[in-house]
């Protein structure tokens, strides 16, 4: 399975308008496309950064959808004030403990490794890091997206409420240090978001 992320910086005061556009215009459009298996949206109301992710059953379906989403991407650029940064990924891991409701928070960890090391990284993540993450307070789900050509990774860890994410902060930071060392991965950035749209229908992979 594959995913396309669209990252954009918005004026924090107009984020709700952007969310409404994605919910009411973009989501119905992409969900009607062949091979689409859902959409999610993360928003940082302080910085204005938003990430819209669409998931696809195959890489071919993702690429064939490109023509159809150009108009909606241009419309989003009008609302947000700039064109999004678009990246394509393989969804390597999807694991859910339970569904999320209103108020869920997601921490995204971007990193990189040697491209040829990706299979070892994913094996270590599944066998050692992920079981420890399940013990974190409020842990709801995690997904790991990778670009095998560049070695880039993006791990999204979702908690059911801001309070439980806060409770898990120290242990989560410890797991990042331990996990990145064990996986041979360099962490590039860590950021936190509200999970404002959660409609990914990606099947469990573990």
Predicted regions and their residues:
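Short S/T/G/P-rich N-terminal loop/turn motif that feeds into the first structured element of a domain
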Residues: 1-51, 57-206
């Amino acid at each position: 399975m594959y995913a396309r992320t669209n990252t954009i910086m918005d004026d924090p005061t107009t984020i709700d308008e952007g969310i409404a556009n994605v919910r009411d215009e973009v989501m119905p459009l992409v969900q009607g496309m062949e091979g689409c298996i859902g959409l999610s949206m993360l928003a940082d109301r302080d910085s204005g950064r938003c990430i819209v992710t669409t998931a696809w059953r195959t890489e071919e379906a993702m690429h064939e959808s490109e023509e159809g989403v150009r108009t909606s991407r241009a419309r989003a650029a009008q609302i947000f004030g700039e064109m999004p940064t678009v990246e394509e990924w393989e969804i390597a891991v999807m694991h859910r403990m339970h569904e999320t409701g209103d108020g869920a928070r997601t921490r995204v960890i971007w990193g990189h490794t040697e491209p040829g090391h990706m299979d070892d990284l994913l094996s270590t993540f599944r066998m050692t890091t992920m079981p420890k993450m399940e013990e974190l307070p409020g842990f709801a789900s995690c997904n790991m997206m990778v670009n095998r050509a560049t070695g880039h990774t993006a791990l999204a860890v979702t908690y059911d409420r801001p309070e439980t994410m806060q409770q898990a902060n120290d242990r989560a930071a410890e797991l990042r240090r331990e996990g990145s060392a064990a996986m041979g991965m360099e962490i590039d950035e860590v950021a936190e978001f509200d999970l404002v749209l959660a409609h990914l229908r990606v099947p469990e992979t573990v």
